[in-house]
């Protein structure tokens, strides 16, 4: 695979098409930022880790191009624990206090939590205003900022309250990865590995070959990984924007992973609970093991996946203290389930994921029990 130029763009087709731009320096590109604000109001939503680095610069860039803008700001506590209905309410209040009209724009400056919250607030305010995703984590660049899924968590489960709301644009400034903690970089790489696992064996091999460059945050390697991941997601989302079929493949490992996240209380900066990417890494191995148990795949493929995740210093086992029965109960609330039956994304080997309905709970419980 050849390395890309410093700037890449990926078109997402559909009823509301948009472009993902991947390049350094985008947060300082005043004209590019401002062109997406149709009216006079903009809300900049960020978190306590990202805002000190970038919020003032984004505000200054917007005002440089559009001095007439009225810009509100909302900074939330960093971490999944902030992705709640209460915080969503704070975003709605911020839009109301700004006097935002239907031509307003919400800028999501941060990782997946910020993107989900900002997108959901934009979807709901006046039945829908524009949202521009400014992802600052690798995970957000390759997954959560793309595709228009927005949601918050409730105690019963992750992402159970939300809406589909495609962004007006995604501007992935790769310079922001310089300030990304190593653990968060690895979490994003779990989602990158997912794309190879579900539909691209050559990408899977490339990730193994480039593992040292990626872990060292080599700009060219990261740009290639981001672009290839976004290309895969864009192709699938264009064909299945509302997740009626093929788009569910993007959830390999997520049913198991979301159950782990919910049962342990969600990861947050500074705690030992698995973050989203880490939980997905474990979930992918569990899905691969279940596939092998059901006779769908070879155990060698499971081991290849486990080995690649280990190469990227990601976990592959369920954390201790999480009862299998409790995890299964969480899985029963997964959004992909139909008529009370488990519907999981499994695989027939590397690059061959598929959705499997009516998976027997006994088989899942056996995998959860180790």
From Swiss-Prot:
EC nos: 4.2.3.4
Subcellular location: Cytoplasm
Entry's Gene Ontology cellular component terms: cytoplasm
UniProt cofactor(s): Co(2+); Zn(2+); NAD(+)
Listed pathway(s): Metabolic intermediate biosynthesis; chorismate biosynthesis; chorismate from D-erythrose 4-phosphate and phosphoenolpyruvate: step 2/7
Enzyme class label: lyase
Any one GO molecular-function label of the UniProt entry: nucleotide binding
Keyword tags: Amino-acid biosynthesis, Aromatic amino acid biosynthesis, Cobalt, Cytoplasm, Lyase, Metal-binding, NAD, Nucleotide-binding, Zinc
BP GO annotations: amino acid biosynthetic process; aromatic amino acid family biosynthetic process; chorismate biosynthetic process
InterPro entries named among the record's database cross-references: Dehydroquinate_synthase, DHQ_synth_AroB, DHQ_synth_fam, DHQS/DOIS_N, DHQS_C
Domain of life: Bacteria
Pfam families recorded: DHQ_synthase, DHQS_C
Residues the entry annotates as binding Zn(2+): 191, 254, 276
Binding note for cofactor: Binds 1 divalent metal cation per subunit. Can use either Co(2+) or Zn(2+).
Chemical reaction(s) catalysed: 7-phospho-2-dehydro-3-deoxy-D-arabino-heptonate = 3-dehydroquinate + phosphate
Binding site for NAD(+): 112-116, 136-137, 149, 158, 176-179
PANTHER family tied to this protein: 3-DEHYDROQUINATE SYNTHASE, 3-DEHYDROQUINATE SYNTHASE, CHLOROPLASTIC
Physiological role: Catalyzes the conversion of 3-deoxy-D-arabino-heptulosonate 7-phosphate (DAHP) to dehydroquinate (DHQ).
Family in the record: Belongs to the sugar phosphate cyclases superfamily. Dehydroquinate synthase family.
Name by which UniProt lists this protein: 3-dehydroquinate synthase
Organism: Xanthomonas oryzae pv. oryzae (strain KACC10331 / KXO85)
């Amino acid at each position: 695979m050849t390395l890309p130029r410093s700037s890449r763009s990926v078109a997402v087709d559909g009823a509301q098409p948009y472009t993902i731009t991947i390049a350094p320096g985008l947060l300082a590109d005043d004209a590019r930022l401002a062109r997406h604000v149709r009216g006079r109001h903009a809300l900049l939503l960020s978190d306590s880790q990202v805002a000190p680095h970038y919020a003032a610069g984004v505000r200054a860039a917007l005002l440089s191009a559009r001095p007439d803008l009225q810009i509100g700001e909302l900074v939330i506590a960093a971490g999944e624990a902030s992705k709640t209905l209460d915080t969503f309410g704070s975003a709605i209040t911020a839009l109301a206090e700004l006097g935002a009209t239907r031509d307003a724009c919400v800028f999501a400056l941060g990782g997946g939590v910020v993107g989900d919250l900002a997108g959901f607030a934009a979807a709901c305010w006046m039945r829908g205003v524009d949202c521009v995703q400014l992802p600052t984590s690798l995970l957000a660049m390759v997954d959560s900022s793309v595709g228009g899924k927005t949601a918050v968590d409730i105690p019963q489960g992750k992402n159970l309250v939300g809406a589909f709301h495609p962004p007006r644009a995604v501007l992935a400034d790769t310079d922001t990865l310089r300030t990304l903690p190593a653990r968060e970089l690895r979490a994003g790489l779990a989602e990158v590995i997912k794309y190879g696992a579900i539909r691209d064996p050559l990408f899977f091999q490339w990730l193994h070959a480039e593992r040292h460059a990626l872990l060292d945050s080599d700009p060219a390697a990261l740009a290639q990984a981001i672009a290839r991941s976004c290309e895969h997601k864009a192709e699938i989302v264009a064909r299945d924007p509302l997740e009626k079929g093929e788009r569910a493949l993007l959830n390999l490992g997520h049913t198991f992973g979301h159950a782990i996240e919910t049962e342990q209380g969600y990861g947050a900066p500074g705690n030992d609970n698995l973050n989203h990417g880490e939980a997905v890494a474990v979930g992918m191995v569990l899905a691969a093991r279940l596939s092998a148990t059901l006779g769908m795949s070879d155990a060698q493929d499971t081991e290849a996946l486990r080995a690649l995740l280990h190469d990227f210093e990601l976990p592959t086992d369920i954390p201790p203290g999480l009862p299998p029965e409790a995890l299964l109960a969480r899985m029963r609330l997964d959004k992909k389930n139909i008529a009370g039956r488990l519907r999981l994304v499994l695989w027939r080997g590397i690059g061959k994921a598929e959705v499997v309905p009516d998976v027997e709970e006994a088989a899942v419980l056996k995998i959860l029990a180790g």
